[in-house]
Amino acid sequence: MAEELLDEGLRIRRHPLLRFRDGPTGRRVALVCGPDVWELVGGLVGGDVAPDRRVERAVELFGLRREQVEAALAYYAEFTSEIDAQVEANRQAAEEAEALWHRQQELLAG
């Protein structure tokens, strides 16, 4: 645990607009007073928006300042595989929750 906290502290020094939080899929990095970095990634990478408009669109969609979105993007650039793993973990958790809900509905229907 001490090693994890030290690592997080060093990362926060390099990325001061971010903080670590506990969540249903484990520790994750998020903007201070903002969404998790993995949530922003979907609006920044890929999608139907031209690359030169993606930061501005994320600013609009999430109600953030440009420097916040750029801070999240900088963290993602440095720790891409970590954030991609969080995206995947959250996708899997959502699928499992949906499957459970469907099973509950089947049981209720008899």
Show where each model-derived region lies.
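Short, basic interhelical loop/turn and adjoining N-cap
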Residues: 59-71
